[in-house]
């Protein structure tokens, strides 16, 4: 073969390539748009599946990505109304989980037989109950096989000024405070003050978002503990009605 033949073939190939028409930019744009729409549609379907299952936080995550990456897609336009709903519901779901996590539940065996069940949560803010600084205040509902049902506050420091009975003020959400009977038993086992009408308090908590209890302390005056009660799982204390 002539030594010049490969060079001639290469030159011919290059010439043919040079003669090939350039790719239409509109075709490339259309291809990318189609690919983007396909990807957006897949995200929209994931979004709609999460909405159908009421998984609002998952739905919002899909909607966030879809509207950020493909804001002008048909899929984004289709889910727009549902996406706005998902954003609101996701915030509600997050708040519901936060409120539920404030409560703690215990079930303990009792030596004499049966089980003691309790539901408890701490006040929203620490309170100075003894003049020595802010401390925790806890609200507890207890169901004991021998002692029955009771509701009470427990102080981490200081003491209640309610020996022999007193009136505390109970405020429910935005309603005006009302007096309720309470008592501090003569015991050193725990610094506890019982709300006498535990059934009333339980029913109040079940239907409230926030309650505030103003109580007298030995350090002087009164203190107010605010409890975010909206996340109570009433099924954890099945004996309470």
Placement of each model-derived feature along the sequence:
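C-terminal motif of bacterial Sec signal peptides marking the signal peptidase cleavage site
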Residues: 15-18
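A generic "folded-domain core" signal
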Residues: 20-68, 74-241
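Bacterial N-terminal signal peptides that target proteins for export
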Residues: 1-9
């Amino acid at each position: 073969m002539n030594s010049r033949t490969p060079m001639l073939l290469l030159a011919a190939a290059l010439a043919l390539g040079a003669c090939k028409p350039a790719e239409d930019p509109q075709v490339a744009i259309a291809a990318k748009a189609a690919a983007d729409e396909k990807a957006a549609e897949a995200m929209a379907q994931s979004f709609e599946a999460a909405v159908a299952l009421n998984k609002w936080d998952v739905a919002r995550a899909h909607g966030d990505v879809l509207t950020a990456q493909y804001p002008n897609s048909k899929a984004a336009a289709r889910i727009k109304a549902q996406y706005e709903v998902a954003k609101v519901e996701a915030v509600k779901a997050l708040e519901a989980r936060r409120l539920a996590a404030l409560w703690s539940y215990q079930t303990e065996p009792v030596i004499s037989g049966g089980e003691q069940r309790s539901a408890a949560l701490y006040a929203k803010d620490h309170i100075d109950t003894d003049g020595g600084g802010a401390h925790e205040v806890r609200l507890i509902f207890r169901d004991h096989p021998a002692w029955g049902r009771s509701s009470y506050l427990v102080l981490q420091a200081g003491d209640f000024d309610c020996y022999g009975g007193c009136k505390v003020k109970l405020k429910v959400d935005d309603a005006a405070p009302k007096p309720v009977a309470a008592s501090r038993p003569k015991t050193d086992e725990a610094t506890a003050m019982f709300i006498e009408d535990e059934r009333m308090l339980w029913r109040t908590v079940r239907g409230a978002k926030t309650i505030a209890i103003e109580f007298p302390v030995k350090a002087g005056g009164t203190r107010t503990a605010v409890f975010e009660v909206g996340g109570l799982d009433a099924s954890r204390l099945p004996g309470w009605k």
